[in-house]
């Protein structure tokens, strides 16, 4: 099992589909990384040599923000929105949809379980 950016990749998958197991790397980014390092998409994770794993790790470390650093940055960005008191920050603080979705009937995921307001 190859360990890339602190994540154990599944050894039987093709490397282009295994790299997205790292938070912050999707399929497109995975292909860009493999092109830059010069590794075939068809190669399986268990077929990678130590040098190839090291090259992928080095390229990711130098060019991308992944895993803990990226999670921390996203959390800090959301906290900054809440601190400055902008509309998006208020929506985050209240636990409501941030991107303009309707909330009269939907948004159950963000709002949580329905609370009935009693009628007389």
From Swiss-Prot:
Matching Pfam families: Ribosomal_S13 (PF00416)
Molecular-function annotations in GO: rRNA binding; structural constituent of ribosome; tRNA binding
Q: Which GO terms describe its biological process?
A: translation
Q: State the residue spans of region: Disordered.
A: 97-120
Cellular-component GO terms for this entry: cytosol; small ribosomal subunit
The record's section on SUPFAM superfamilies has: S13-like H2TH domain (SSF46946)
* Keywords, ordered alphabetically: Ribonucleoprotein, Ribosomal protein, RNA-binding, rRNA-binding, tRNA-binding
Instruction: Please name the InterPro entries in this protein's record.
Output: Rbsml_uS13_C (IPR027437), Ribosomal_uS13 (IPR001892), Ribosomal_uS13-like_H2TH (IPR010979), Ribosomal_uS13_bac-type (IPR019980), Ribosomal_uS13_CS (IPR018269)
Q: Which family does it belong to?
A: Belongs to the universal ribosomal protein uS13 family.
Role:
Located at the top of the head of the 30S subunit, it contacts several helices of the 16S rRNA. In the 70S ribosome it contacts the 23S rRNA (bridge B1a) and protein L5 of the 50S subunit (bridge B1b), connecting the 2 subunits; these bridges are implicated in subunit movement. Contacts the tRNAs in the A and P-sites.
- Subunit-structure text: Part of the 30S ribosomal subunit. Forms a loose heterodimer with protein S19. Forms two bridges to the 50S subunit in the 70S ribosome.
From the Swiss-Prot or TrEMBL record, give the protein name: Small ribosomal subunit protein uS13
Q: What is the source species?
A: Nitratiruptor sp. (strain SB155-2)
């Amino acid at each position: 099992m190859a360990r890339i950016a602190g994540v154990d990749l599944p050894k039987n998958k093709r490397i282009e589909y295994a790299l997205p197991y790292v938070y912050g790397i999707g399929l497109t980014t995975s292909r860009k990384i493999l092109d830059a390092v010069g590794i075939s998409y068809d190669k399986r994770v268990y077929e990678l040599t130590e040098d190839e794993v090291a090259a992928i790790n080095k390229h990711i470390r130098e060019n991308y923000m992944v895993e803990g650093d990226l999670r921390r940055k996203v959390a800090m960005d959301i906290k900054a929105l809440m601190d400055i008191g902008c509309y998006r920050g208020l929506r985050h603080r209240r636990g409501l949809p941030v991107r303009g979705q309707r909330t009269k009937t939907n948004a159950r995921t963000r709002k949580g379980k329905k609370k009935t307001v009693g009628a007389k």
